[in-house]
Amino acid sequence: GFDLGMNTAGGFGEYIRIPSEWAVAKPNGLTLRESMIIGTAGFTAGLSVQGLVEHGVTPDKGDILVTGATGGVGSVAVALLAKAGFSVVACTGKKEHESFLKTLGASKVITRDELLENKERPMLKEQFAGAVDTVGGEYLAQAIKATQYGGAVTCCGLTAAADLNVSVFPFILRGVSL
């Protein structure tokens, strides 16, 4: 996390001195070993799901979209959401992994091309109560445009692009939170 190994030496050290605000408390329900197994991808997925819940997204509100669903963060997000009772729509560029995503708990699998349909439109039909975006760019924009009134989108990736080109309509007209 933060800039360990990039701008702060010691990323591979057994011990390192860091500012206290960089430290994250170990969850009470996990052992040290379990918390390390989860790793960065699991931690990021957990924070993304927590973000949806903190914005009032609940299983009864509708489907949750997860982009980049076969990746590390995406696959853990699919599993966490399904375990929490959400109906998950997994978006992937690897349609051959549909059975893997269904095993994790996805109720539906869509392709990237399906998600990008009508991308020129400023808003799309309300399809999702929320989304976990691990890809960024036009995929994040489409997730925002397809989120229903009062929904939320969490974003944590930028493999497609770091920029976001979307109108303010979903935020103003639907109260979507990002």
What is the predicted function of each stretch?
Residues 13, 106, 127-129, 171:
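Local beta-strand N-terminus motif with an aromatic residue
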Residues 11-12, 93-100, 162-168:
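Short, glycine/polar-rich helix-capping loops at beta-to-alpha or helix-loop-helix junctions
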Residues 1-25:
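Glycine-rich phosphate/adenylate-binding loop and adjacent beta-alpha elements
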Residues 36-112:
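Mid-domain Rossmann-like dinucleotide-binding core that forms the NAD(H)/NADP(H) cofactor-binding site
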Residues 115-126:
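Short amphipathic alpha-helix with an adjacent loop that forms part of the alpha/beta core around
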Residues 33:
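C-terminal boundary of histidine-terminating zinc-finger modules
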Residues 3, 7, 138-178:
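Glycine-rich phosphate-binding loop and adjacent beta-alpha segment
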Residues 129-132, 154:
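N-terminal Rossmann-like NAD(P) cofactor-binding module of classical short-chain dehydrogenase/reductase
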